[in-house]
Amino acid sequence: MFAVYLVFSFKKPEASKADLDFFMLTFKYILKGSFFLMLVLALFCALFTFDLMFSAKNLLYPNEYIWDSGDFFFYKNGALKFSLNLYGLILVFLCLLTGFVAISTVDNLYSEDKLKFYLIFFQFFLAVLGFIKCSDLIAFFFFYEVLMLGSVLVVFFGSYSKKSIHAVIYFVAWTQLGSLFVLLACLYIYSLTNSTNFFVIKTFVFSKTQAMTIYSLLFVGFGIKFPIWPLHYWLTKTHVEASTGFSIYLSGFLVKTALFGFYRLTNLIQVELDTTFFLAVLVAGVIDSSLNMWSQTDLKKLVAYCTIQEMNLIAIFFLKGDSSLIAYGFLFTIMHALMSTLMFFLVECIYSRYKSRSTLVVNGVFFSFNNLALAIIFMVLFFSGILGTLKFVCEFFVFNLTLHVSWPIGVIFVVVVSAIGLIGFSKNWFNAIFCAPSKDVGPDALDLSKKELYIIFLCFAGLIFLTFLPFLMI
């Protein structure tokens, strides 16, 4: 079934017009629907298989440790045991969603190039399953590095300029620097506990000095990929030079793996720590990215700074360790993935029509493409965090937390994020929408296609659903 799907999906430009026959189109849609159902079924089978591979933890240790690992669903029937991590399930969902949208942006490639993207995505998916299910430091670090390998291949094969090579070098250098700090933290944990098993490590009593050392190494190591201030400039460069498909996957999924790694490993340290300094770094990252939105003329770079701002906001939820805040952190993670996917996809829609991402060139979208302009307006409304959206609820908790730590810093933080950053973000998009057209887009330029409308609708449907989800949690 998968082979037949590839045959009908990978068409070269010189394909015959017979493919437009109604029967052929119907058959193709049936194949794609069947492939999607098989993919969902394979997801649950793979999760069950990976759980059996790592089930030794459930057989060798008491059942109460399963709940300590963050699993939200547990089934036991004799020797058969099944558990699943909540954040891990979110990562799998984001992997599939962002992968689907990212691959949909490369329709103009030949079959051989498309096949590379599918194979890399399959490698991503296997690495994600191992990453969320393993309970060993060595395996955890191994799968974390395997995720980076696929990222390099996507950037390398998805961009065809010399600057893309520089982006690959930037990406590899900075992520490997972060991995070095994570590796040092893992080695230090092993030297103290003489074990790489998560459940043994969690029962070990760390001193405050040891815990702070481990926490600092993990914060810097994973924080480079969040990214934290001032180690985030590699991300904007990579976004600008890489393909839109990779930008969607990087912002919607890959940065979440670093946050998951930080959350899971720091949960092994059962010591109360003063995290004021780390909170200050995250606040500085939010303020810096908010101010940088004012000076951007490249829409893709503007979205990259939005990613930095929101990822630092999400990290604040996990920094405090409060269960209620972490629950909203999970929701904020999904919301950011949908929002960043939507924003990067809208940038791709603009680029395909104007052949530019610069706000100096892209003007008058509303006068030429009404549906595209309407989608951008609703995107800005969801990003603004107006009353009734999930972002409003999440930002309320973050602002309340910063105000409790320091009133002066909290007030500055609220003003910069809610006013200065939002205005800087909105003005660039509204200039592109409502300014008088300065470039003829040509008579062949069309409004949003059915595929583009479907992807945009999918993102908005997810954002609307998440808007009502907090009321179900009360």
From Swiss-Prot:
Organism: Paramecium tetraurelia
InterPro entries: NADH_UbQ_OxRdtase, ND/Mrp_TM
GO MF terms held by the record: NADH dehydrogenase (ubiquinone) activity
Catalytically driven reaction(s): a ubiquinone + NADH + 5 H(+)(in) = a ubiquinol + NAD(+) + 4 H(+)(out)
Annotated GO biological process: ATP synthesis coupled electron transport
Name by which UniProt lists this protein: NADH-ubiquinone oxidoreductase chain 4
Taxonomic superkingdom: Eukaryota
One Pfam family it belongs to: Proton_antipo_M
This enzyme's EC code(s): 7.1.1.2
Membrane topology according to the record: Multi-pass membrane protein
Main localization category: mitochondrion
Role, per record: Core subunit of the mitochondrial membrane respiratory chain NADH dehydrogenase (Complex I) that is believed to belong to the minimal assembly required for catalysis. Complex I functions in the transfer of electrons from NADH to the respiratory chain. The immediate electron acceptor for the enzyme is believed to be ubiquinone.
PANTHER family: NADH-UBIQUINONE OXIDOREDUCTASE CHAIN 4
Transmembrane segments: 34-54, 86-106, 115-135, 137-157, 167-187, 211-231, 242-262, 276-295, 302-322, 325-345, 373-393, 405-425, 454-474
Transcription recorded as keyword: no
Enzyme class name: translocase
Disulfide bond residue pairs: none
GO CC term, one of those recorded: mitochondrial membrane
Gene field: ND4
First and last residue of the signal peptide: none
UniProt keyword terms in alphabetical order: Electron transport, Membrane, Mitochondrion, NAD, Respiratory chain, Translocase, Transmembrane, Transmembrane helix, Transport, Ubiquinone
Family as reported in the entry's similarity comment: Belongs to the complex I subunit 4 family.
Keyword Mitochondrion found: yes
Places the protein is found: Mitochondrion membrane
